[in-house]
Amino acid sequence: QQNSYYIAEHYLSMGYHVLTPDLRASGLSGGRYLTLGYRESEDIVLWAKRVAEFYPQAKIVLHGVSMGAATVMMAAGREDLPSEVVAAVEDCGYTNADELIAMQMENSFGLPAFPAMNLLNWRCEKVAGFNLHDAAPIDAVRHARVPILFIHGTKDTLVPPNMAEQLYAAANAPKKELLMIPGAVHAAASQADQQTYFRTIRKFVQPYMEEQK
């Protein structure tokens, strides 16, 4: 959440209002289980709709980091995304959860993807009611309804940089841009090169925030 506040401060400095909700099963939000962005994307859409109810002239930019980025990408591809959402910024999100977890199992614990992933998926379905295959931002961005800015650090060892390239290539957004931050590790691009990070965001989102409805 500290990272969220750091980023929020920069949006505030651009003159925007900021809402930083905790995702389900995190912080002050309810729920028992994370779904790696799958059901969280439903929550974000509901938050956006709620904002639009109170502020009919609102223009909303979704910004997420890591799992938040996966959530934002999946929200961007949802048919029920409200028209008040005009752009999205994803920072170090993954292509799909099952591929990422399988890779980390092998790299960090030396476990083969099979049968470990089958067992994990069975457990997720039984306990949390979702399939890891459902958490697939790369499928969502193929149906993106808003412009997306993709950001990733070149030294990210948790979510490999090539995932950002795959997401960018797959995205069928009205507009898209890819920013790679040299030397940045996972979820630290905004600190590694603050000037480039926020300058690029401002340049990307500003035209959509200033458009007349």
List each language-model region with its residue ranges.
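Acidic catalytic loop of the alpha/beta-hydrolase fold
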Residues: 155-159, 187-188
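Catalytic active-site module of serine/aspartate enzymes centered on a nucleophile-bearing elbow/loop
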Residues: 192-213
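Alpha/beta-hydrolase active-site loop
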Residues: 34-55
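Catalytic histidine neighborhood in serine/cysteine hydrolases
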Residues: 169-187, 194
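Short alpha-helix in the alpha/beta-hydrolase fold that links the catalytic acid
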Residues: 137, 146, 160-169
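Hydrolase active-site cap/lid region
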Residues: 74-130, 139
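Short beta-strand/loop motif that positions the catalytic acidic residue
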Residues: 143-145, 150-152, 156
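The serine-hydrolase catalytic nucleophile loop
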Residues: 1-10
